[in-house]
Amino acid sequence: MNDVSQKAEIKEMLASDDEEESSPKIEKAYVPKLTGTVKGKFDEMEKHRQEEQRKRTEEERKRRIEQDLLEKRKIQRELAKRAEQIEDINNTGTESASEEGDDSLLITVVPAKSYKTPGKTKDPEDLDREEGNGRTNHEEDKMRYEEECRVLKEAKCLSLVMDDETEAKKESHFPGKLKSTFEELERQRQENRKKQAEEEARRRLEEERRSFEEARRHMVNEEDENQDRETVFKEYRPGKLKLSFEEIERQRREDEKRKAEEEARRRIEEEKAAFAEARRSMVLDDDSPEIYKTVSQESLTPGKLEINFEQLLRQKMEEERRRTEEERRHKLEMEKQEFEQLRQEMGKEEEENESFGLSREYEELIKLKRSGSIQAKNLKSKFEKIGQLSEKEVQKKIEEERAKRRAIDLEIKEREAENFHEDDDVDVRPAKKSESPFTHKVNMKARFEQMAKAREEEEQRRIEEQKLLRMQFEQKEIDAALQKKREDEEEEEGSIVNGSTTEDEEQTRSGAPWFKKPLRNTSVVDSEPVRFTVKVTGEPKPEITWWFEGEILQDGEDYQYIERGETYCLYLPETFPEDGGEYMCKAVNNKGSAASTCILTIEMDDY
C-alpha cells in the first residue's frame, strides 16, 4: 500500500509540475521578432545592453571583493608592523599583552558559507528556483559581509586608538608618544583618503571610457544602419539634406531671376518694335500727304480744316518726340560721363570691394533722388548701368562662393574619413585609446566651427542676394513710375485731341487756380520715398500748400516742397506706416482757390 500511495503522490506531483510548466509557457509565448525591422533591432540592442550591464556589475563586484581582500591584507601587515614596534619598545613584561592585543586585532571575519542539506533529487524547475534563491542569498551574504567588513574596520581603528591610549598610560615616562601615534593615524587617514580619491578618479575614468565606447558603438551602429538604408534607397543621402534644400532654393531664385530678366527684355523688345513701327508709319505719313488728302477729300468735302489740324498735330507730336529723344540722348551722355568720372575716382577701391562700391553708388543715387535734382528717368538709366555691371560681379561672387562651399565640403568629408580611420585604429589597438580617448571630440569641435563658418558665409551671401533683389524691386518701381508718367502724357495728349483745350482757355481766361494734373492715389513700400506731383495754372501765380489729414505740412527735411514752373511736388524722403492717409494740395490766389486730394497706402516690406 505504501508503494502504491507513493507512486500516486509522485504522479500527482508530476502532473502538478506539468501544469506549472504549461502555464508559464502559455503566458510567455515565444513571438518571433522581425530581424529587418527597427523594433527587432531595438530589442537586440536592449538585450545587448542588458548583457553588458550584467557583465559590468559582475566585474565591479569581483573588483570590490579583490579590493576588500587587499585592504584586509594591508591592515594585517600594518598591525604586524605595529606589534613588532611595540615589542621593540617594551622589551620587558609587555610581550604577552601585545601578542594578545595583536591576536585580537588579527581576527578575520570569514563570510558564512551556505551549506546544502543532502536530500532527495528534485525536478529541474525546483533546482532553478533554488539556484535563484541561492543567488539572492549569496548577494545578501555579500552585502552582509561588506557591512561586517566595514564594522570590523571601525572596530580595528577604535582598538588601535584604545591600544595607543593604554600604552600611553603604561609608558608615561616616554614623553611625546601619544602625539606621535596620533600623527601616524592622521597620516594613515590621509593616505587612505588619497587612495580612495585615486580609486574614485580611476573609476570615473573607467565609466567615462565605457560611456565613450558605448557612444562610439552607437555611432558605428547608426552609420551601419545609414549604409543599409543607402543600399535600399539610393537617392537618400544622410547629412546632405540641408545643402540640397539650399541648392534647390538657390536654383529656384536663379530661375525666377532669369524669368524676370527675360520678361523685362521681351517687354523692352516689344516696346522697341512698337516704337519702330510708329516711327515707320509717321515717316510714311510724311512722305505721302497727297494720299491722305485725296482720301479725306473723297470722304469729306469740307475736310480741309480737319486735314490741316491733323497735320499740325502730327508736326507737333513729331517735334515733341524729337525734342524728348534729343533730351534723352543728352541726359544719357551726361550720365555716362558722370558714371565714368565716378569709376575713375573710385579706382582700385571698387575693384577691391565691389559690393561696397555698389552700395556707395546706391547711396549717392538715393541722395540725388532725395534732393530732387534728378528725375525718374535718370534713376532708371543709372540703375540699368549698375545692373549691367553688377550682374557679372554677382555671378563671379556666386561662383566663388560655390567653389568655397565645395572646398569646405571636401575638407569636412576628408576629416570625417580620417576620424573614421582613427576610430578603426582605436578599435584594433585599445592600448592607444587609453592615451588619447577624446580625439573624436576635438575633431567634432573643429567640424562644428567649420559648419558655423559656412553658415555665416551663407548668411552673408543671402544678404547680398536680398540687396540685389531690393535693387531690382526699386528698378521695377521706377519702371512703373515711368509707365505711369507715359500714360499721363498720353491722356493729356488725348484730352488735347478731344477738344479740352477750349476748357483750358476758359480756365486761363478767368485767372482762378486750376489743376492741369491733379493728385492720384498711390501706394509705396514701407521706408521708401514718395513724391506727389501736380500741375497748377492761375493768374496771378497761386500759393501752394500741402495738407495731411486736415493739418498743414510745413516745408522741412521730412516734407520737402519742390517748385518748377507750373509743376509742384511734395517729396517724402522716407515713409512709415503712420504716413498713410489722405493728402491734399491747395492752390489759392486773389481770383479763387482749388484743391486736389489723394490717398497714400503704405505696404509692408517682405524682405
From Swiss-Prot:
A single BP term in Gene Ontology: regulation of cytoskeleton organization
Composition bias, Basic and acidic residues: 1-14, 40-85, 120-143, 167-221, 228-268
Places the protein is found: Cytoplasm, Cytoskeleton; Cell junction, Adherens junction; Cytoplasm, Myofibril, Sarcomere, Z line
Modified residues (Phosphothreonine): T301, T502
GO molecular function ontology, one term from the record: structural constituent of muscle
Endoplasmic reticulum listed as a keyword: no
One GO term describing the cellular component: adherens junction
UniProt keyword Lyase present: no
PROSITE patterns reported for this sequence: IG_LIKE (PS50835)
Sites of Phosphoserine modification: S16, S172, S281, S288, S296, S495, S500
Domain Ig-like, chain residue ranges per copy: 513-601
A Pfam family this chain is assigned to: I-set
Keywords: Actin-binding, Cell junction, Cytoplasm, Cytoskeleton, Immunoglobulin domain, Phosphoprotein
Region (Disordered): 1-143, 165-268, 419-444, 480-514
PANTHER family the record matches: MITOGUARDIN, MITOGUARDIN 2
Subunit and interaction comment: Interacts with F-actin.
Function (record text): Involved in regulating cell migration through association with the actin cytoskeleton. Has an essential role in the maintenance of Z line and sarcomere integrity.
Name of the protein in its database record: Nexilin
Gene: Nexn
